Design a protein with these regions (language model features):
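Catalytic-core regions of core metabolic enzymes
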Residues: 1-316, 321, 328-330, 336-743
């Protein structure tokens, strides 16, 4: 089922006007009864047909013995029946021409395994062009169209708003809908196993709803990866951020996902590549997700960075300290200890605090997250100084707590002054917002004053959610002002907000240079068997990744001839195809400055490791990096760049992208490496050509596109990076049966 037919079926399901409930029940607490209750709560008032051969009537309503008794096809068949009855009922619905179905049950088949029944249900629905939510789901609430097709009692009414939710987890679905966050929903789907209709379909539908400003995903696996990738790019092009919580990135997590849903979980490289390619925001837990959704859902964005940093207003001095790392925030503190500053790089945050210790806490956490505070200008400093009591420093993050007099004026004025600074991308009132026993409303009113005085993002950042005054938080949220619940989760949300920018270029739109015959030439050679070391370097050179002069040798005489060709000093390496890590077996000898040294080294290596060698010119010194191509079972070939050398596995410092890559995307991957400062020659080290490294990443991405169907994995380690460019010193290529990229 593809194209308009698929989209039409999804729309018929999520906007259903006629619904059949198979398994309707009058028994209180039963699934069939709860489903009826929820459908009756639907503001759209759909026509609902009850089906259950056990009953003639349920309450005042007629109950039919069979789905076949309904005269006309319906938009949605809700199957509130046991797994044993699912196939029969879905076949009946498909034969009648019903448009869609929800399968709430898990669709397990005793004695047959998990795949059999689910595969047959999938085939039935696809053959009939039906949309299908589930199996193993809680259903959906189409808030924008007033439809509640869920079998569990959820908040009524569910507040309308900017968030479209799709989750593989039913428990997370219920928890998010019940969270007292005033998030507001346009659509909420518990999609379960996604036998037919998948996350990509729901995203595409949600993008067509006027109210959707952000999409929230909880994903156990990638289903229909190509369709999901396209949907995520459409979301980015529409300026609708996608926030995803992914699970199953560890071996234990993958096993649990498989046990839970039978799904192959994407590992961390899969998710990282997806985020790198589409701009999808990845969060680590539900706390980070809800803070991020609330902040982005408020609808305000940090302006384009004319200068670095954002500034926070703190009510304590200790929460304020930070230096530069990229775009940042601003905070106001009410105590001096919370304030230690870090310098600006791009937009930053600003924060205002009323406690010194909590300001320091915020600063420490922000620093650990690479979230910078804005470097505010002299005009802002002067405005702040005029508001503060004597002895308080006018800096960002800001501790405003002196005598406590005129708290509303000082807090609101500080927040507003920081928001007006060009270097500030977002402002946080970083206070605990506890219940004020004396009825004081200074914090509430100051936050609202600041929100109304600027168009920049303003939020309240509470450090201890359990102490948060829920009534005060509700008032602020009703005014549109986000209240972030937790130091780390709130600061991460601010970092995500500041990361929003121009959408990445979809891989399909990246134009690779045309090299007629290149792919055919290498496919033919690779089909003949493994490459020699010099051939592997030639392959890389064909894709713009140079290497030193190199020649293969199968005897001492050939080695000496090769050395004469490349010039002394030379490097001698074993070229046995079964040895992956040459240095581990003593298979590399460097600094051979003449024929005698080379002959002796050759004889020694040949005696231990066999006669096949490669003789290479000695490369100039540089920083050792690594490049790679891996074939992901879900996304196809992926490109990896990271720290190289003998510590590559230990350091595990790498970034992953989906080919083909633009130069901008490749530079971004390099910039995000922890080892990136080393390339600038720290402590007198060698300064590497970062542009050449990024160009090598781009070249490898073109190789991955052209040859990713025959190469299972490719490692370039080390890739020597110096001031004159890069040189690939070794390459390991694993071949496999030809495969096209998964769709």
């Amino acid at each position: 089922m593809t194209g308009p037919t698929r989209a039409d079926a999804v729309r018929a399901m999520l906007e259903a006007r006629t619904i059949a409930v198979v398994g309707a029940s009058p028994r209180p607490g039963s699934f069939g009864a709860r489903l009826l209750t929820e459908l009756e709560r639907s503001p759209s008032r759909p026509t609902v047909h009850l089906v259950n051969p056990r009953y003639d009537r349920i309450g005042a309503r007629v109950c039919l013995p069979s789905l076949g008794e309904i005269p006309d096809p319906v938009d949605l068949v809700a199957l509130a029946v046991g797994d044993h009855a699912l196939e029969e009922q879905l076949v009946l619905a498909a034969g009648r021409g019903d448009r869609s179905s929800v399968i709430y049950g898990s669709a397990f088949e005793n004695g047959v395994g998990r795949g059999g029944l689910r595969a047959r249900l999938t085939s039935v629905a696809n053959g009939a062009g039906m949309a299908l939510c589930g199996a193993g789901c809680m259903g959906f609430v189409s808030v924008a169209h007033g439809l509640r097709a869920i079998g569990y009692v959820e908040p009524d009414p569910l507040p309308a708003g900017p968030v479209a939710l799709v989750t593989h987890s039913g428990s997370a679905f219920s928890a998010l809908l019940r969270a007292d966050r005033r998030l507001g929903w346009s659509l909420a789907v518990s999609s379960g196993q996604e036998l037919v209709t998948t996350t990509a379909d729901y995203i595409d539908y949600a993008l067509g709803l006027d109210g959707t400003r952000v999409v929230a995903l909880l994903l156990e696996t990638l289903r229909r990866p190509a369709a999901l990738l396209a949907a995520l790019h459409r979301a980015a092009a529409a300026d609708v951020p996608v926030v995803a919580l992914t699970v199953g990135g560890t071996p234990g997590g993958r096993a649990m996902v498989a046990a839970h849903s039978g799904a192959l979980a994407g590992d961390d490289a899969t998710w990282e590549a997806l985020c790198e390619s589409t701009g999808m925001i990845r969060v680590a837990d539900l706390a980070e997700m809800t803070d991020t959704l609330e902040l982005i859902g408020a609808g305000r964005r940090a302006p384009a960075p004319p200068a670095p940093g954002i500034s926070p207003v703190h009510d304590s001095g200790a929460e304020r300290a930070l230096g530069p790392v990229g775009r940042g925030i601003a905070s106001v503190h009410d105590s001096g200890a919370e304030r230690n500053a870090i310098g600006p790089v791009g937009r930053g945050i600003a924060s205002v605090h009323d406690s010194g210790a909590e300001r320091a806490l915020v600063v420490d956490v922000a620093h650990s997250l690479d979230l910078p505070f804005a470097d505010i200008g002299p005009e802002t400093t002067a405005r702040l100084a005029a508001l503060l009591d004597d002895g308080l420093d006018a800096t960002n993050p800001l501790d405003v707590w002196g005598t406590g007099a005129s708290a509303r004026t000082v807090l609101a004025g500080s927040l507003t002054a920081l928001a007006a600074d060009p270097s500030v991308g977002a402002v946080a009132l970083a206070v605990d917002l506890v219940h004020e026993l004396d009825g004081d409303r200074s914090y509430i009113e100051a936050a609202i004053d600041a929100w109304d005085a600027t168009t920049k993002p303003v939020c309240v950042l509470a450090n201890l959610p359990s102490a948060l005054d829920r009534t005060a938080a509700r008032e602020l949220r009703d005014h549109g002002l986000p209240v972030l619940e937790g130091t780390r989760s709130g600061l991460l949300a601010l970092r995500h907000l500041l990361s929003l920018g121009a959408p990445p270029t979809p891989p399909a739109e990246v134009v690779a240079p045309e090299m007629p015959g290149r792919r055919a030439r290498w496919v033919t050679r690779l089909a003949a068997g493994p490459l020699r070391a010099d051939e592997a370097l030639a392959l890389l050179a064909d894709y713009g990744i140079p290497g030193p002069a190199a020649h293969s040798a199968g005897s001492r005489a050939e080695a000496l001839t090769a050395a004469d060709a490349v010039g002394y000093p030379v490097v001698l390496k074993t070229d046995r195809p079964d040895i992956s890590h040459k240095s581990d077996v003593g298979g590399v000898v460097v600094g051979l400055d003449g024929p005698e040294a080379l002959a002796a080294a050759y004889d020694e290596l040949a005696g231990r490791l066999g006669p096949d060698m490669v003789v290479m010119a000695t490369a100039p010194p540089g920083v050792e990096m690594a490049l790679g191509v891996v074939r992901d079972p879900l996304l196809g070939p992926l490109v990896v760049v990271g720290a190289g050398g003998v510590l590559v596995e230990l350091l595990a410092d790498r970034r992953v992208g989906m080919p083909p890559l633009t130069a901008t995307a490749a530079r971004r991957m390099v910039q995000r490496l922890a080892v990136r400062p080393v390339l600038d020659g720290i402590r007198g080290g060698i300064v590497a050509d970062v542009g050449a490294l990024a160009a090598a990443v781009v070249g490898l991405s073109h190789l991955a596109v052209e040859l990713g169907d025959v190469i299972v994995a490719l490692d370039v380690n080390p890739l020597r990076c110096g001031p004159g460019g890069v040189l690939a010193l070794d390459a390991l290529i694993e071949l496999g049966p030809s495969q096209s990229r998964p769709g």
